[in-house]
Regions:
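Non-transmembrane "mature" sequence context
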Residues: 1-146
């Protein structure tokens, strides 16, 4: 996750108010995720990833958990919480690498040739996919060949 700050990941999840705590370290964030994040983080994350596109927000929410699961439980399962944190980390890294929240949103939701013409936000739903997206973003951030 370095050099990405925990606070930036928290912002993508909706902040301390939405998460219900304010972790400042990776250890604290991991413990918060392991307990299960509140269901509200799904809509906050979706809004941060695609605020002006209802269909894209639905896609992002579906990457975390099903609508039926959200209706049944107030908290996400640990597995769904990990997915939410992973996607929030990618949203935060895209903002950092691209320097602009709007540019990051466009990049996350547009098919990318280095990701098999898939949308980066969708590729990042798996651990391996997130690593691929992180590599592309780090190359962008540090002006390396993409």
């Amino acid at each position: 996750m370095y050099p990405l700050e925990v606070g930036k990941v928290m912002a993508a999840l909706g902040g301390a108010r939405t998460v219900g705590s304010a972790p400042n370290t990776l250890v604290e964030l991991a413990a918060t995720v392991a307990r299960g994040l509140p269901g509200e983080v799904v809509s906050a994350l979706a809004a941060n990833a695609a605020p002006d596109d209802v269909a894209a927000r639905r896609r992002v929410a579906a990457l975390v958990t099903s609508a039926a699961s959200l209706k049944r439980r107030d908290r996400l399962s640990p597995v769904a919480s990990e997915r939410a944190e992973r996607l929030a980390r990618i949203v935060a890294l895209a903002r950092q690498a691209l320097g602009d929240a709007d540019e990051a949103r466009l990049w996350l939701n547009a098919p990318h040739p280095l990701l098999g013409s898939a949308r980066p936000i969708e590729v990042a739903a798996t651990d391996l996919g997130a690593r691929q997206v992180e590599r592309v973003l780090h190359n962008i951030e540090y002006d390396l060949p993409v």
